[in-house]
Amino acid sequence: MHYAMEQRCLYDYNLSELTELLQSWGEPAFRARQLYRHLYVNLARQVDQMTDLPLALRSRLAEIPFSTLRCEQVQIGDNGMTRKALFRLPDGAVVETVLMVYPDRSTVCVSTQAGCGMGCVFCATGQLGLLRNLSSGEIVAQAIWASQELRAMGMAGPTGRVSNLVFMGMGEPFANYDRWWQAVERLHDPQGFNLGARSMTVSTVGLVKGIERLANERLPINLAISLHAPDDALRSELMPVNRRYPIADLMAATRNYIAKTRRRVSFEYVLLQGKNDHPHQAIALARLLRHSAPRGPLLFHVNLIPWNPVPGTPLGRSEWERVTTFQQILTDYGIPCTVRVERGVEIAAACGQLAGRHSVPLNTVEQEIPARNVTG
């Protein structure tokens, strides 16, 4: 989809582009490195905080926004350890970002599109349809916001930023591949945000061409694939993308990815009561993965996800006994399997619940705090 915004923001520039911009203004290259450090290491909220830059340069930089994201609402759940931000974009589109804090780490769940065009029936974002792709700067700004929140909470740790990032928010990353990958490279850059590649995970509904591209990238970020069914008939019902990329094609791309990268692949499987959680479906899933695995150590992992309620859908959440039975069957077949720890359900921030709206009843929210923009 065509990117609707015309003006570039500071987070849209990599270091080379910032250098070129500032040199076109008559500034030496080292000024760009100083600016880059303020943006990605110091996490400056305002140009006025960049006191080592000349006043004239700061005045000129003040004419360029850091980001287009405007935070309209932040909701808090899980006793303060989960925060969901709703950002408004200049064209009226909205996206959501979720920060989850644990005793030993922090994870931000980032959106790559406003809405989503994949149409998965169990996902709130899929009901919105695709509004537009995000720019690389709009993706990056979400990680900056999360790190600024951590610092405000006094929980940023020695790195001063989030420790993990998952591209599992609104949208399909591989449908916005170029801008998404630009964001990955900027967040990984050791001269800036310096987030390790293996601390980032991208989730896809199974766009085969995207998996093939990722296999050839230089950064070994983690890959998660939304599977959700062991056969084409059911997967096509739940995920329309399967009609274009059926399971056989998806598994072939996955085998090729593992052969090239020797990296483990996670398969996400949301459990729906009476739909895809029967014992025979667990057996079928185990056999599918065993049959599809390349030779050598099994580099597959299944992440079972109890479905989180989405208004307007006839689906139901699997009973816990069915979840544990499903997990045990996979384990018995030698498939590594875990059940995802739930976070943010009460503020509609959990897996599949992001819908970019204010309509969460406030009596389900532990606390609502005033919004803060990424730039102050």
UniProtKB/Swiss-Prot annotation:
Name any one Pfam family assigned in the record: RlmN_N
Q: What is this protein called?
A: Probable dual-specificity RNA methyltransferase RlmN
Any GO CC annotation of this UniProt entry: cytoplasm
Where is [4Fe-4S] cluster bound in this sequence? C116, C120, C123
User: Which residues hold S-adenosyl-L-methionine?
Assistant: G171, E172, S203, S226, L227, H228, N308
Tell me the InterPro entries matching this sequence. Aldolase_TIM (IPR013785), Methyltransferase_A (IPR040072), RlmN_N (IPR048641), RNA_MTrfase_RlmN (IPR027492), rRNA_lsu_MTrfase_RlmN/Cfr (IPR004383), rSAM (IPR007197)
Cofactor(s) needed, names only, are: [4Fe-4S] cluster
- Where in the sequence is the active site? E96 (proton acceptor), C351 (s-methylcysteine intermediate)
Q: Write the Enzyme Commission number(s) for this entry.
A: 2.1.1.192
Name the principal localization, coarsely classed: cytoplasm
Bound cofactor: record note: Binds 1 [4Fe-4S] cluster. The cluster is coordinated with 3 cysteines and an exchangeable S-adenosyl-L-methionine.
Keyword annotations: 4Fe-4S, Cytoplasm, Disulfide bond, Iron, Iron-sulfur, Metal-binding, Methyltransferase, rRNA processing, S-adenosyl-L-methionine, Transferase, tRNA processing
